[in-house]
Every structure is written in C-alpha cells, then in structure tokens.
C-alpha cells in the first residue's frame, strides 16, 4: 500500500464515522419522544395493580420519561437562546427573545415540578391512570417535539426552519393536539368517559412516528431564509404549547398547596 494514501483513507473513515454518528444522533432525537409517549402506556398496564395501591415508585416510572424529556428539551432551548450571540440590538428588538427565554424556562420548571407532584399525588381509579399515562404525555410532548426539531431560535431568526412539506405535517400534528386538549378540558372534570382525547393522542403518536421516520431516513434541509409564513408557524407552535402547560401546572399547584396547608395546620 502506498503510504501517501493513508491520510486519504483516514479522512474517508473519519467522514463515514461522522456521518454514522450524525445519523444515530438524529435517530435518537427523532424517536425519543415516541418512546416517552409509548413507555408510560406500556408501564401503566404492567404496573396497574401497584398503581391502584398508589405506589409512588410506579407513579414515578409512569410520569418520569415524558416530563423529563420536556424539561430537558426546554432547558436546552433556554440555554441555547441565552448563550446565543445573534440577538439584535435594542431593547424592543430583544423583547421576543426575552419572552421566549421566560417561556422555555417556565415550561422546563413546570415539567420538573410535575415529576414530583404527580408522583406524590393520590391517583383515583382508572381515569387518573389513563390521564397520567396517555393524556398528559400527549399534551406536553407534541409541542415540545415540534419546538425542538422544527425551530432554531438560537440563530437570531425566530422562525420555523424546516421545509414546507414538514410544515404541513407539523400543522396536522398541532391541529390534532389542539382538538385533543380542547376535549380534555371539556371532559376532564365530568363524570363522562370520553375516548376522543385518547384517539387524538394516538393520532398524534402516529403522525410523530411518520415525521420521525421521514426525518431519520430522508432528512430535510434546514432553511435560514426569512419569510412571514415561517415566523407565523413558529409563533403558532409556541402559542399552542401554552394551554397544555397551563393545564399541566394545575396539578403541581394543587398538590403543593395541599401539602403546604397540611404542614401549616400541623403547626
């Protein structure tokens, strides 16, 4: 072998390794939300008897992965924006960035606190089990997934960065999410068993699966070109994620308020 070919072979191997590594990273990023949605459903059936006995460990296993995924992704978005060097000058121009910083940090904190709150909360019957294992993961993972994959607010342009075809899929996912959360709010406090939130949760799972397969095997090229529709989709994703976290934060507020009141009364 000619010794002059060694650097070329090394460079080729390095490129192949980098390409394979990038593929695995993309696959992990795309399929981790699917695991976080599916895992609580499977575990809820496996550990149903212990959950019925309000075992804290069983409840922790069910709620951990979805809320941990949400907390990590939003804190990464917050850190990326906070450390970005692409912020415009001027206070008014920076206000959208400060607003997003606040939202991402708030969503991350809500997700982290929800792990504690829903673990110590007393679940009552199958309705609470289905709500924590199916509805809640659907409410927080869908918008989190779209924010972390289709948007890159750290580049100085607050907008949707994917292709128009991906935008269509994302809008369908968001539509399913919005209908699902509306039905959840309407039927959550009623003594009526409504299957529709679960149907839309399943539909969102299938759509995210299809989108993840597309992005893993046929990745889209990110675009930095600025346009009104890209900004509009980004704003729509952010605004749509707020009701899900408002509904989620009610749980930690109720749980912590109850424990604080019990602590105050004991004194």
Swiss-Prot record:
Q: Which domain of life is it from?
A: Eukaryota
Looking up Pfam families in the UniProt record yields: DUF2463
Listed InterPro entries? UPF0328 (IPR019081)
Assigned protein family: Belongs to the UPF0328 family.
Question: What name has this protein been given in UniProt?
Answer: UPF0328 protein ECU03_0110
């Amino acid at each position: 072998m000619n010794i002059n070919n060694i650097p070329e072979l090394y460079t080729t191997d390095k490129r192949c390794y980098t390409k394979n590594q990038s593929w695995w990273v993309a696959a992990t990023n795309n399929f981790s939300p699917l695991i976080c949605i599916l895992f609580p459903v499977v575990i809820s059936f496996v550990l149903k008897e212990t959950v019925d006995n309000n075992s804290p460990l069983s409840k922790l296993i069910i709620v951990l992965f979805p809320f941990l995924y949400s907390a990590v992704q939003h804190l990464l978005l917050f850190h990326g924006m906070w450390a970005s060097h692409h912020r415009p000058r001027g206070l008014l121009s920076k206000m959208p960035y400060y607003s997003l910083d606040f939202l991402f940090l708030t969503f991350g904190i809500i997700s982290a606190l929800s792990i504690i709150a829903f673990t110590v909360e007393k679940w009552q019957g199958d309705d609470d089990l289905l709500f924590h294992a199916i509805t809640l993961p659907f409410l927080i993972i869908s918008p989190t997934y779209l924010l972390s994959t289709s948007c890159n607010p750290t580049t100085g342009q607050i907008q949707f960065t994917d292709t128009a075809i991906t935008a269509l899929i994302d809008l369908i996912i968001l539509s399913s999410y919005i209908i699902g959360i509306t039905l959840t709010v309407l039927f959550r406090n009623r003594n009526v068993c409504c299957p529709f939130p679960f149907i839309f949760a399943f539909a969102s799972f299938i759509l995210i699966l299809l989108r993840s397969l597309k992005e893993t095997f046929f990745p889209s090229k990110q675009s930095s070109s600025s346009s009104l529709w890209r900004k509009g989709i980004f704003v729509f994703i952010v605004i749509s994620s707020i009701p899900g976290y408002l509904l989620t934060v009610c749980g930690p507020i109720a749980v912590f308020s109850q424990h604080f009141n019990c602590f105050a009364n004991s004194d």
